[in-house]
């Protein structure tokens, strides 16, 4: 039996990044996610070196998030996806955590080594949070050095795989790596990383593939949030108010 899904990585809130371009786009993405079985959806706007989370941007994201939450048929929660950058090492990871959890989503840069990832993940961990490593299977670093996945797992940093890698959308290398990470137990959660209607926030297709390959019992924790405790913990009503920038 297919479980209700928890999707911990999406870009459904218009935030100035490469995700939803406006509220109508975000609503359409959320409605499709709900129809395909998602019960809880984390909106995780990008925090890039060239698109940081200023107080003003945080206010803008929060307003868009609250407006979107009113008009969507699923439970929408807020978090952020961090790209490693030195200034983040001076910030409190709590600001970026997936709402209601101690998890902070961090991506491995697609191109180049993963050096910055380790510094940021260690900073997150030292503050009492868990770094969740986003889509490592899509990165040049893991393709060049497959043992990187073992190093991350040995540190206790869970790996999040993209549905689109498992379905082959990102090419045979990403597909093969994603399946290997599931089969060796390093992949702890599958998420959509949905950006737009041509790359939607839905988990159902990947769930069918994974459950057919490893069985429903093994597949369920990858998709229902229980593997990271994302379903059990409820978010606080709202985050602390942002300051004007």
Language-model features: locations:
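An N-terminally biased module of ancient metal coordination in phosphate/nucleic-acid-related enzymes
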Residues: 1-73
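Short acidic/histidine-rich active-site segments
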Residues: 186-202
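Active-site environment of divalent metal-dependent phosphoester hydrolases
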Residues: 48-51, 83-85, 138-142, 166-169, ...
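Non-catalytic positions within long, well-ordered alpha-helices that form the structural scaffold/packing
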Residues: 31-34, 125, 182-183
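Mid-to-C-terminal alpha-helical segments outside catalytic/metal-binding sites
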Residues: 204, 208-245
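Active-site neighborhood of phospho(di)ester-bond hydrolases with catalytic His/Asp-centered motifs
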Residues: 6-8, 42-44, 77-81, 132-134, ...
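Extended substrate/RNA-proximal surfaces in nucleic-acid metabolism proteins
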Residues: 52-160, 239-245
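Short, acidic/polar
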Residues: 23-30, 87-90, 115-118, 176-177
């Amino acid at each position: 039996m297919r479980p209700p899904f928890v999707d911990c990585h999406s870009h459904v809130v218009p935030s100035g990044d490469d995700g939803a371009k406006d509220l109508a786009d975000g609503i359409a993405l959320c409605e499709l996610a709900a129809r395909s079985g998602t019960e809880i959806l984390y909106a995780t706007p990008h925090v890039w070196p060239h698109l940081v989370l200023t107080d003003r941007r945080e206010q803008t994201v929060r307003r868009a998030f609250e407006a979107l939450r009113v008009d969507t048929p699923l439970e929408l929660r807020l978090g952020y996806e961090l790209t490693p950058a030195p200034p983040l090492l001076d910030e409190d990871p709590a600001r970026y955590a997936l709402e209601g959890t101690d998890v902070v989503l961090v991506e491995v840069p697609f191109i180049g080594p993963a050096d910055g990832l380790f510094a940021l993940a260690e900073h997150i961990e030292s503050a009492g949070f868990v770094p969740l490593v986003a889509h490592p299977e899509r990165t040049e670093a893991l393709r060049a050095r497959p043992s990187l996945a073992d190093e991350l797992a040995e540190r206790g940093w869970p790996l999040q795989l993209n549905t689109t890698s498992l379905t082959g959308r990102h090419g045979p290398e990403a597909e093969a790596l994603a399946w290997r990470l599931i089969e060796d137990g390093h992949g702890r959660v599958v998420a959509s990383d949905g950006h737009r209607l041509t790359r939607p926030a839905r988990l159902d297709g990947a769930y069918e593939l994974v459950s057919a390959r490893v069985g429903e019992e093994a597949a369920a924790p990858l998709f229902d949030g229980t593997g990271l405790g994302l379903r059990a913990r409820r978010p606080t009503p709202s985050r602390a108010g942002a300051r004007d920038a």
